[in-house]
Amino acid sequence: MNDIETRDTGTKNDNSSEFNLSVKSHKRKRSFDDENLELEESREETSGGILKKAKTQSFSESLERFRFAHAGSNNEYRKTDVVKNSDTDNGLLKSAVETITLENGLRNRRVNVTKKSTLKASVKKSTLKKKNEVDPALLQGVPDYICENPYAIIVGLNPGITSSLKGHAFASPSNRFWKMLNKSKLLEGNAEFTYLNDKDLPAHGLGITNLCARPSSSGADLRKEEMQDGARILYEKVKRYRPQVGLFISGKGIWEEMYKMLTGKKLPKTFVFGWQPEKFGDANVFVGISSSGRAAGYSDEKKQNLWNLFAEEVNRHREIVKHAV
């Protein structure tokens, strides 16, 4: 009987526990429902009379909200309590839009910089292309400037594109011809010339000409036949003007063609820059190194030393002539 009473008591206790849990659960659900009702009323008030209400939350949603809710201002995050028309969300949306706009702005700035650099490069490329598109066959050569019986005649290979376009000898900024000539003191009275003064060389007892008259972008564009023809024409010029000291040949390649025209042979391997044992049209020959920027195999110092040697001989002859008068 005691066992029966115990079992009955246990059953009553179990039923009592279930009843208590049900009451507690009902009270909690009612509490959440009341809170949801207050929330809906609050939303209606803040929406300024808008009839559209937020979706009623289920018990599980309320329980989820209870887990993540925090006491504090409306700016604090709640997982399920999201109202699209609230000031808080509008602020967050505005902030997000501003962030995206800023990122896009920075990205656009980077793109614009890239486009600007590309534009500069394309402008330089188009300018270079335009220069290269000049047909040398349509260009004119530069004139010779030679006086009767000069002290010396300077001989270049042929006019470059820049020289042809400007109409003056050795006009390219990469060519150091005029700088080396000035530094050698070949001109009288310590004068200093630029390519614009090529016509003034005869006033200093000097002349200037080229092996070939045809302009080209490079000496490699010249044909062997026209260089040999140029050597023969140069030979006649030298005999015609009769330089007193000799010829200054601005580059070994020029002398190779002149030597071949004279002898029918190639220049010997024993060649040395400076005064040559052969004469050309009864004139002495001095071979210097090309002043072109492409002649990078020799130092500027060596090039200048050769200019100085030739200038010394010319100036020595000038003094002799002056004293003779």
From Swiss-Prot:
UniProt GO cellular component terms: nucleus
Bias (Acidic residues) ranges: 34-43
Protein EC: 3.2.2.28
Major location (coarse): nucleus
Entry keyword set: DNA damage, DNA repair, Hydrolase, Nucleus
GO terms for biological process, alphabetical: base-excision repair, AP site formation
Pfam families the UniProt entry points to: UDG
SS bond partners: none
Localization terms from the record: Nucleus
Highest taxon, organism lineage: Eukaryota
GO molecular function annotations of the record: hypoxanthine DNA N-glycosylase activity; oxanine DNA N-glycosylase activity; pyrimidine-specific mismatch base pair DNA N-glycosylase activity; uracil DNA N-glycosylase activity; xanthine DNA N-glycosylase activity
Region (Disordered): 1-50
Record keyword Cell division present: no
PANTHER family on file: G/T AND G/U MISMATCH-SPECIFIC DNA GLYCOSYLASE, G_T MISMATCH-SPECIFIC THYMINE DNA GLYCOSYLASE
Its biological purpose: Removes uracil from G/U mispairs in ssDNA. Also corrects G/G mispairs. Does not catalyze the removal of thymine from G/T mispairs.
NCBIfam families: mug
Stated family: Belongs to the uracil-DNA glycosylase (UDG) superfamily. TDG/mug family.
Protein name: G/U mismatch-specific uracil DNA glycosylase
Gene designation: thp1
